[in-house]
Amino acid sequence: MSAIVDIVGREVLDSRGNPTVECDVLLESGVMGRAAVPSGASTGSREAIELRDGDKSRYLGKGVLKAVEHINTEISEAVLGLDASEQGFLDKTLIDLDGTDNKSRLGANAMLAVSMAVARAAAEESGLPLYRYLGGMGSVQLPVPMMNVINGGAHANNSLDLQEFMIIPVGAPSFREAVRWGAEVFHALKKIIHDKGMSTAVGDEGGFAPSVENHEAAIQLILQAIEAAGYTAGEQIALGLDCAASEFYKDGMYVLEGEGGLQLTAQQWTDMLASWCDKYPIISIEDGMHEGDWDGWKILTERLGHNVQLVGDDLFVTNTKILKEGIDKGIANSILIKINQIGTLTETFAAIEMAKRAGYTAVISHRSGETEDSTIADIAVGTNAGQIKTGSLSRSDRIAKYNQLLRIEEDLGDIAFYPGRAAFYNLR
């Protein structure tokens, strides 16, 4: 038995300089697991609740001392003596202890830090790398990275409404090569932006945030960079968008400031997205509609769902109850998986499994406020998810995940598998 003998929570900083929760879990054998949780900028209204102190005299009210105290008192008392290898039982203990639907009493940030740290400790105890511990011998598939090279929306101070413009190396023969392709396009893009006299400063997720005239201009910059780096857009490197449409939905209309204040109905906005998909090699669109606009989602899915991956992030918030409703109604064809949206590893894996059974893809994702913790890299391989979103090719909080995936690919050796375009099995 891998008995838990000590738990220590602490307040540390994330990549934006805001406090977040870190947890150490010590086992009887002397083995320790450590994990730190991320935090989002644009969040879904039905996400599990991240507990913040609200004390304006510390960190502008964003301190997490209450969440840390919950780890060091209540949670510690409840889990000391439990077997760290019983992840499901441990997570259920945390959920029952919290007693709310949205983890608002203890805080999803406190619960997730413990859940992740326990898994790390148990993996260490078993002598297995985390991805193998989580997924077993069948965990051999590396994820296709969706690399956020231009930022807009809530992640940048420019005129772009859409939050992320991504490159997807679908034609790469391996994960290592996919990362190289992405890095080379990133550097080509930096040169193009610089040569146009625009800022090459990067946003929260490591992508550039140039002030361009409209969204198509941003797409065209990326296409130029792909070509300049020596690759073929579409065949080798596809494009993805994260609209984060809940952020520009006002009074039932989609208001695009970056398109001159254009106000569009869901049907008109779908038409615009469809026209971009016809013109450019876009194979994935995330949060194309407001999280509450299920009629809009239905229009979008019926129009584009056969040949474009439509990812629900704010829509599904990694929640099986909401995902099941979406599957039943034929809404979207993919779910974004953010561990802190739901608050435990067990519930995260349940959402991935439900998506796969329904023929939906599951895209493992970072948050805009990250740490050096690379657990999501191991989750991506451990669950054979096939896709990961973990930012651009800069900032060590993003690179930490790419580097961990490079190590995993090396560890797997000849049995490592990079799916490329096959990761988009929801498209026909």
Swiss-Prot record:
**UniProt xrefs under InterPro entries:** Enolase, Enolase-like_C_sf, Enolase-like_N, Enolase_C, Enolase_CS, Enolase_N
Q: Where does it live in the cell?
A: Cytoplasm; Secreted; Cell surface
Gene Ontology terms, cellular component aspect? cell surface; extracellular region; phosphopyruvate hydratase complex
The alphabetical list of record keywords is: Cytoplasm, Glycolysis, Lyase, Magnesium, Metal-binding, Secreted
Please give a single GO biological process term from the UniProt record.
Answer: glycolytic process
According to the UniProt entry, its GO molecular function terms are: magnesium ion binding; phosphopyruvate hydratase activity
- Could you tell me what reaction this enzyme catalyses? (2R)-2-phosphoglycerate = phosphoenolpyruvate + H2O
Q: Does the keyword Disulfide bond apply?
A: no
Pathway membership, UniProt: Carbohydrate degradation; glycolysis; pyruvate from D-glyceraldehyde 3-phosphate: step 4/5
Which cofactor is recorded for it?
Mg(2+)
Could you tell me which CDD domains the record lists for this protein? enolase
Binding of (2R)-2-phosphoglycerate, residues: Q163, K338, R367, S368, K389
**Annotated binding of Mg(2+), by residue:** D242, E286, D313
Q: What is its EC number?
A: 4.2.1.11
What the entry lists under PROSITE patterns is as follows: ENOLASE
**Bound cofactor: record note:** Binds a second Mg(2+) ion via substrate during catalysis.
Family the UniProt entry places it in = Belongs to the enolase family.
**According to its UniProt entry, what is the function of this protein?**
Catalyzes the reversible conversion of 2-phosphoglycerate (2-PG) into phosphoenolpyruvate (PEP). It is essential for the degradation of carbohydrates via glycolysis.
Protein name in the entry: Enolase
Gene for this protein? eno
